[in-house]
Amino acid sequence: MPSDREGAERRVRTDWRDHPRLVEDVGRLAEVRGGRARVFGFGPAATLAAARANEALGLPGTPTTAVTALMDKAALRARSNTLHPARPVSFARCGRAALLPFLTTLIGYPCVIKPRAGAEGEGVRLVGDAAAAEAAAPQYPEITDLLVEEYLEGPELAVEALSREGRHRILGWTRRLPGPGLTAAGHDLPVALDPATAGAVRNLVRGVLDLTGHHDGPSHTEVVLTPRGPRLVEAHARPGAEELTQLLRLAHGTDVLALAFAAGLGLPEPVRRPRAAHAGLRYVDFPPGRRLAEAGPRLAAARAVPGVVRARLTVPPDTVVRAAPTGGHHHAQLLATAATAALLRSTLDDAADLLARDPRDPAPGRPCRPPRQPDRGFA
């Protein structure tokens, strides 16, 4: 991502997926030999590669065991349940897809099926009844490694934190706006929580990081505010997606990546400059078969809406959409800021309409936005 190249003094061309080559190429730097460096990885796979490289080079950082502990969703669920033993989250591991109907019935409906070591939401399904479980089973390999767990009902937060020598600093959180099924329509902030709930969220995040041995570096934790209290969805030894870190930067002036670099390298923290009262992210997806014609003018129109900070496609322009997006992937993103929550929502709605409108549709202003959701319990 562009923000992790800002201020770079030297570039080293290497293949970070090739561990021996990465260690060899980076190990030639004088700063690495002197212990005045650190390898960073901010993606699902790059996080583990960076941890392995730091250990091989004798550099500080989150240990590989902590990264893998957060990646193992079954072990993470078992650990996090110790933080609320009176009301744990029900779950079961599944090694054969044919057992899914039995295990989902055992857990109860609705429930969630997810790969034990998956990433970016791929392979995650919400199952509402036995028929849906029967239909889901053929979608996975016969011999598999899945997790079946109860569906957590309530508002969801994405929490960004930064750890240093075992001290976990909560940098901020965004509210996840639910879309159809388990998808997200976007995120926004600020999120008003009462002091007791906010404290419980912080305690859960810090407890999870302690239990997995995550002592240094950024983390991203997904939390649902259930009627029984905050419950963990997943946690990762890396920042959230680039658009989420940009949200915190826009609204709070909190630069998650710059803070991670500063903490890892022992540098002064960047100056915090809050920029907006409200900031929001909206995902836009197109139906299969849609040709993204005239993408350039429609992007320009969306960017021209007052308050829009960024509008971009994540698929090539002038192509035909072959399938609906899966997991956490989306066809387009919008970022905006505003003085009020109502103005933010209106800004994102207007920009989404301009971006998503089919040029063959003669009816101007036809809504193409994700369905509006209630606040679902936020103050």
Residue ranges and their predicted role:
Residues 125, 150, 193, 249, ...:
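Short, well-ordered beta-strand elements within core beta-sheets of diverse protein domains
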Residues 10-17, 90-96, 125-128:
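Short acidic-hydrophobic, aromatic-tinged amphipathic segments that line or gate anion-handling sites
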Residues 82, 261-379:
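Peripheral (often C-terminal) accessory segments that flank ATP-dependent C-N-forming ligase machineries
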